[in-house]
Amino acid sequence: MISLDKDENEIEHHNEENSLVEQETAPVGQESRQLSASAVKSLSDIAKWGKISGILLIIMGSLVTLSVLMTVIGAIPGVLLIISGVFLMRSAKAAAEAEGNLTGSAGESMLENYGTFIKMQLFYAASSIVTVLIGIIVAIFVLVVIGIAAFENTPSYDDPDSYYYEDDPVFE
């Protein structure tokens, strides 16, 4: 099951990967700067609407996955929507924890999860395009097969029963 919270080992491992440049600028970044009122409102909107959008993405992904579960290719966009919803909810949760300043792990977590959400949306869009193209190709193939089958069943002048209609009109 995908958790909305990262475990502590993952957070510690990520913090250890900071480059020297990030470590040198850390004291400057640790200063507590208050954000403007519009930035605080934006964080509030991200927290509120991000959570709602994340829940809707998870629900929509579940429905897409269940509706096309017959094929693995069809289920891939649904799974990607679920993953996108989880990362959007994580980003919204981090935005709610930021409380007016983006310093510390809340701001980093929000931006990291939002970046992952954007990547998942790219993969979702690409897989949806591929799925639609495959669907169009299959639909064209089915229509061609139906057309060939209908053409084969159409009576022609070579049919032995056609002599009834050649000389005498059916309705007089």
From Swiss-Prot:
Residues 1-27 are annotated as: Disordered. It comes from the Bacteria. It holds the Pfam family DUF5362. Keywords: Membrane, Transmembrane, Transmembrane helix. Coiled coil: none annotated. The keyword Transmembrane helix applies. It is a single-pass membrane protein. The keyword Ion transport does not apply. This is Uncharacterized protein YwnG. The gene is ywnG.
